[in-house]
From Swiss-Prot:
HAMAP family: RbfA (MF_00003). The keyword Nucleotidyltransferase does not apply. This is Ribosome-binding factor A. It comes from Xanthobacter autotrophicus (strain ATCC BAA-1158 / Py2). It holds the Pfam family RBFA. Its main location: cytoplasm. Monomer. Binds 30S ribosomal subunits, but not 50S ribosomal subunits or 70S ribosomes. Keywords: Cytoplasm, Ribosome biogenesis. One of its GO terms (cellular component) is cytosol. The lineage of its organism: Bacteria, Pseudomonadati, Pseudomonadota, Alphaproteobacteria, Hyphomicrobiales. NCBIfam families: PRK00521.2-5, rbfA. One of several proteins that assist in the late maturation steps of the functional core of the 30S ribosomal subunit. Associates with free 30S ribosomal subunits (but not with 30S subunits that are part of 70S ribosomes or polysomes). Required for efficient processing of 16S rRNA. May interact with the 5'-terminal helix region of 16S rRNA.
Length: 151
């Protein structure tokens, strides 16, 4: 097996592409309502992200019910129906092997809201205003640095 020579440690293009295919297929299955579970039928579920393992055998699906409430029963219902969902995802994709589906709560919306609130806090706004005024003022040291470099 060829060693991983990529730098940066991020996902490969194939991992990203397959993750996106799984995300679309899973969202399609959930949207059509073909799952007979009453918990899943009662919720509209979004699938913002799917992360693939390097060997493409495991798909970690980040899900969130619309409104963000009752996430625990939804995750349990998805896990209970993972076998059926995997079968349906496999029917919609042309892959050698269909990955195992694992479900996790998507916290990206909460993280985004937290960051937005943090950036809007008075202390951060004040600090950002201070740094922007420092960036616009001319720096007296740049001219002297150029003269010493030339010597």
């Amino acid at each position: 097996m060829k060693p991983d020579t990529r730098t940066g440690g991020g996902p490969s293009q194939r991992m990203l592409r397959v993750g996106e295919l799984v995300r679309h297929a899973l969202a399609d299955v959930l949207q059509r309502g073909s799952v007979t579970d009453p918990v899943l039928a009662a919720h509209i579920i979004t699938v913002p992200e799917v992360r693939m393992s390097p060997d493409l055998k495991i798909a970690t699906c980040y899900v969130m019910p619309l409104g963000g409430k009752d996430i625990t029963p939804v995750i349990k219902a998805l896990a209970a129906n993972a076998r059926y969902l995997r079968l349906e995802v496999g029917r919609r994709m042309e892959l050698k092997s269909v990955p195992e589906l694992r479900f996790r709560e998507d916290t990206s919306f909460d993280e985004g809201a937290r960051m937005d609130a943090l950036l809007r806090s008075p202390k951060v706004v004040r600090d950002l205003d201070d740094t922007s005024s420092d960036d616009t003022s001319p720096d007296a040291n740049t001219d002297t640095d150029k003269e010493t470099d030339a010597e």
